[in-house]
Amino acid sequence: FLTAIVYPISGGWQWNGDGWLANLGFIDFAGSSIVHSVGGWAALVGAWMVGPRLGKYVDGKSNVIPGHNLLLGALGVFILWLGWFGFNGGSQLAWGGDDSIAASAVVMVTNIAAAAGAVGAMSVTWIKDGKPNLGMTLNGVIAGLVAITAGCGNMTFGGGFLAGLVGGIIVVFSIEFIDKVLKID
């Protein structure tokens, strides 16, 4: 359903050249809103429908259920980070001459945003909890990557840093809100 109906519709709004979002001047270079936002909302609804894991919410309180293998989680994030270079850089859709320079800049901005997302999430958890949280830092990397995907073809390195940093900070509070207020696991 999502792949056959929802993504083509949301993609058409921006990427068909005459979609209503494109006509409003909306820029989504590599799919931050068109791909990641649609997938994120679908995942949130899916998690709400499936319900929490056993033991997650006991007596109305949110209990931490630790990950099973943080090393494999970190490896997965680093593989995803590497793949994002092809995703964002490949959205340039051409290689050679000036296009190669533009694609290189896209890859650099993407890398800067991912690193800034990690720094943002780690800094917030360090300030809040008195120690860094590797799991949340890895979420910050992904948040930085998602945050830069829309504007990676148009942003400077400083803009990429700021987008990633803000994404990394927001993800910490978003996860807490979804977990503790909305009670979606």
Question: Positions of the model-derived regions?
Answer:
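Hydrophobic alpha-helical transmembrane bundles of multi-pass membrane proteins
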Residues: 1-185
